[in-house]
């Protein structure tokens, strides 16, 4: 796959940032590293899982960790990984704040910021901004936390079906979407409505044929299990982090916890992990295709 960015550092309409997006297992980081080497860039990770410390195998982190959220991949610096403990929460608004700071730092060095990842809402928030969302309400949260995950899903399904379906297996996001809906009377998507761009950017998204994508995700899931993801999960639990913490709610980790609790076999673990990863990758593919101002690269 050949990738041409049509990017010229001497262009009078110089871009502030480059964005490389796409579904999981599509080769985003590889392309970002190639571009950074050619155009003197640094990567800003846009991945809601790679922000967590101690979880490397299951989030497919690459390169060598240096310090303070900084990694080096084949000589290229990557920012905004390993910045939170597994029990800390993160949001699109927080990502925008952190990414804005890194973009400014990279531009001051005369380099190109290359935002790379598959967390679509973070990318959209960075490029177009967020509509004002209500802050967390302690009283409401206390009430919502008494409900089961299925109950949260059922209630949200009536008022914001898109957010309910998208986050049905993530209790933290279900709770937040319901909280936002109750406090504002609006859906999550309405809060992510398009605005004027915040940056002069070039957005390139890798689109992969579903058959190829399914094969790649299946191979990746099997490789992660064989490479120590089960042991990685157990290590985090042994450190005292709760099995329901933010980081362990992600695909793969929650399946491994079921396996460790002897609720499913290792064979079922791999099957369920692979299936949910395939579905997630397909949703990512669909989401990026629906976004404005994107140039696509096809497998």
From Swiss-Prot:
Its EC number is 2.5.1.75. Keywords: ATP-binding, Magnesium, Nucleotide-binding, Transferase, tRNA processing. ATP binds at residues 22-29. Its cofactor is Mg(2+). It catalyses: adenosine(37) in tRNA + dimethylallyl diphosphate = N(6)-dimethylallyladenosine(37) in tRNA + diphosphate. Belongs to the IPP transferase family. This is tRNA dimethylallyltransferase. The gene is miaA.
């Amino acid at each position: 796959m050949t990738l041409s960015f049509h990017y010229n550092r001497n262009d009078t309409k110089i871009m502030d940032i480059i964005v490389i997006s796409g579904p999981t297992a599509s080769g985003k980081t590889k392309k970002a590293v190639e571009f950074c080497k050619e155009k003197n860039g640094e990567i800003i990770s846009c991945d809601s899982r790679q922000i967590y410390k101690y979880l490397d195998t299951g989030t497919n982190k690459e390169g060598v960790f240096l310090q303070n959220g900084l990694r080096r991949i084949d000589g290229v610096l990557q920012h905004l990984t390993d910045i939170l403990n597994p029990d800390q929460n993160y949001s699109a608004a927080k990502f925008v704040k952190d990414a804005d700071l890194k973009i400014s730092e990279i531009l001051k060095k005369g380099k190109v910021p290359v935002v790379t990842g598959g967390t679509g809402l973070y990318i959209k928030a960075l490029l177009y901004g967020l509509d004002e969302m209500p802050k967390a309400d302690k009283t409401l949260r206390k009430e919502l936390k008494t409900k089961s995950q299925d109950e949260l899903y059922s209630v949200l399904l009536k008022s914001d079906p898109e957010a309910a379906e998208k986050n049905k297996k993530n209790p933290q996001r279900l709770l937040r979407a319901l909280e936002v809906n109750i406090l504002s009377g609006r859906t999550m998507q309405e809060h992510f409505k398009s605005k004027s761009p915040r940056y002069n950017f070039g957005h390139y998204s890798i689109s992969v044929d579903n058959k190829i994508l399914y094969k790649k995700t299946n191979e990746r899931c099997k490789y992660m299990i064989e490479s120590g993801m089960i042991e990685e999960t157990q290590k985090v639990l042994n450190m005292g982090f709760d099995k329901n913490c933010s980081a362990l709610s992600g695909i793969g980790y929650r399946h491994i916890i079921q396996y460790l609790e002897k609720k499913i076999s290792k064979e079922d673990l791999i099957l369920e992990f692979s299936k949910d990863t395939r579905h997630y990758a397909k949703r990512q593919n669909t989401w990026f295709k629906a976004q404005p101002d994107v140039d696509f690269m096809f497998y």
